[in-house]
């Protein structure tokens, strides 16, 4: 938890000793998932934060291939932590960037694959004697992945949700469709498809205008994702929780943070 607070309060600080960067690898059945450890200079042991990127083709630095969006937000987070004596591990998700070789066919990918990958990274860090504690920090979709992965992992001592949804994914999608002022027929179609998917049933007759969102190959992933309610999941997190949310986020609102708070009143 202190890791998140240090970042928020002192991102612009500069360490007197340059941080050290190490390339690290997590081996999976599909291939290697690659990441980077950023270690504060001049220390032998320290806390470490595992940083989980958000949805879509977002890399370990927080940059997305969609729209060529480059903000280096997660890289800056890692540097801010290092400046405050805290190590971090960030990684490219399977199928993304340097971890492209570990990608699965879209039809075979499940939300739990990402959760299992993060669990693997937690176990990796747990074996490292250089780290005194582990905090898991997830952004956007990574927040839900993190809160699932950190459970039953005794070395994890804290969890941070950064702009994490407080509602099931299908509710977020429906809210976005409404906010975009789509015709009522579109909103009803989206709600109908989501209704089937959240009950574990694939939909064969998806209209052409919704194929990009509900194509047949992505429906199994959506089914695996829709079954999780972040408000319920966060209630089962047994370590201290920090919820961070901006007011100008166009996808996740302050209301989502409030939903998470209701699920975990001690946060």
What are these regions, as identified by a protein language model?
Residues 43-45, 49-81:
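Short, surface-exposed "cap/lid" segments of acyl-processing enzymes
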Residues 237, 243-245:
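Short beta-strand/loop motif that positions the catalytic acidic residue
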Residues 123-179:
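Primarily recognizes the serine-hydrolase "nucleophile elbow" in alpha/beta-hydrolase
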Residues 73, 106-128:
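Alpha/beta-hydrolase active-site loop
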Residues 160-236:
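Accessory cap/linker subdomain of secreted extracellular hydrolases
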Residues 72-100:
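Conserved alpha/beta-hydrolase
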Residues 239, 252-263:
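Short alpha-helix in the alpha/beta-hydrolase fold that links the catalytic acid
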Residues 16-44, 48:
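N-terminal cap/lid segment of alpha/beta-hydrolase-fold proteins
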């Amino acid at each position: 938890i202190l890791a998140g607070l240090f970042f928020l309060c002192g991102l612009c600080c500069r360490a007197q000793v340059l941080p050290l960067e190490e390339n690290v690898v997590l081996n999976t059945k599909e291939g290697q998932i690659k990441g980077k450890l950023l270690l504060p200079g001049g220390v032998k042991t320290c806390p470490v934060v595992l940083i989980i990127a958000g949805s879509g083709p977002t890399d370990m630095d927080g940059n997305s291939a969609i729209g060529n969006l480059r903000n280096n937000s997660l890289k800056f987070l890692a540097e801010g932590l290092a400046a405050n004596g805290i190590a971090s591990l960030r990684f490219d998700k399977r199928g993304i960037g340097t971890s492209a070789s570990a990608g699965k066919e879209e039809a075979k990918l499940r939300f739990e694959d990402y959760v299992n990958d993060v669990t693997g990274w937690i176990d990796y860090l747990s074996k490292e004697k250089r780290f005194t504690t582990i905090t898991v920090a997830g952004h956007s979709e990574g927040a839900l992945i993190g809160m699932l992965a950190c459970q039953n992992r005794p070395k994890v001592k804290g969890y941070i949700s950064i702009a994490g949804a407080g509602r099931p994914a299908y509710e977020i999608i429906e809210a976005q469709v409404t906010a975009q002022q789509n015709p009522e027929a579109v909103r009803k179609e989206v709600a109908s498809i989501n209704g089937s998917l959240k009950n574990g049933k694939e939909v064969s007759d998806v209209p052409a205008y919704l194929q990009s969102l509900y194509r047949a190959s992505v429906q199994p992933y959506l089914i695996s994702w829709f079954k999780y309610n972040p408000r319920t999941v966060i209630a089962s997190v047994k370590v201290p929780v920090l919820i961070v949310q901006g007011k100008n986020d166009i996808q996740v609102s302050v209301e989502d943070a409030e939903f998470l708070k209701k699920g975990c009143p001690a946060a």
